[in-house]
Design a protein with these regions (language model features):
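Conserved active-site-adjacent core of cysteine acyl-enzyme catalytic domains
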Residues: 47-139, 145-154
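Noncatalytic regulatory segments and standalone regulatory/sensor domains
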Residues: 148-170
């Protein structure tokens, strides 16, 4: 089932929640209800009004792969990519098509072009009009579905830290 940010925002209010961007992003990317995503985050250590640790996020993504039939691939990892960025080279982010079978090789990076010195949610969404992604900035998570940023924040705020592509295996 597909959900939008607006639907998740209403669910968040009805649960009297704040700082639940990871819950909303997971719900939208994996087609889960807010309640299901909230539960999955809670059992991995998320406390009411707080985010989720990277360990919890990794565990959640692995769980979605093994238990729910999704293929989750790392598309961008800033820690890996920083060593390849020198000077004021112009780049742009465009994700390659995500492999959807076990025999396909995982994606660790995409094209070698970003725009300016910062990689933004807006740029990534514009360059990736198809597919589902969970995007992490410094202290925020959001979902992008078919080029549409599902978030309250103005798209483009914050440098990208990690991006995971999500494909449902049928």
């Amino acid at each position: 089932m597909k959900f939008t940010y607006e639907e998740m925002a209403k669910a968040s209010i009805s649960h009297n929640e704040v700082n639940d961007c990871i819950v909303k992003a997971v719900s939208i990317a994996f087609g889960m209800t807010y309640e299901e995503a909230h539960h999955e985050c809670k059992i991995r250590g998320r406390k009411r009004g707080s985010g989720l640790s990277w360990e919890g996020i990794k565990d959640l993504l692995e769980h979605m792969t093994s238990e729910y039939g999704f293929d989750v691939r790392l598309v961008l990892n800033e820690a890996i990519e920083e060593k390849f960025m020198t000077g004021r080279v112009k780049y742009s982010i465009k994700a390659a098509s995500l492999p959807v079978t076990e025999t396909d090789k995982p994606i660790h990076w995409v094209h070698n072009r970003y725009i300016g010195n910062s990689k933004t949610i807006r740029t990534f969404a514009r360059n990736n009009p198809k597919g589902t992604y969970i995007v992490f900035t410094h202290a925020h998570a959001t979902a992008i579905v078919d080029g549409v940023v599902q978030d309250w924040a103005r798209p483009g705020r914050g440098d990208l830290k990690r991006i995971f592509g999500v494909v449902e295996i049928k």
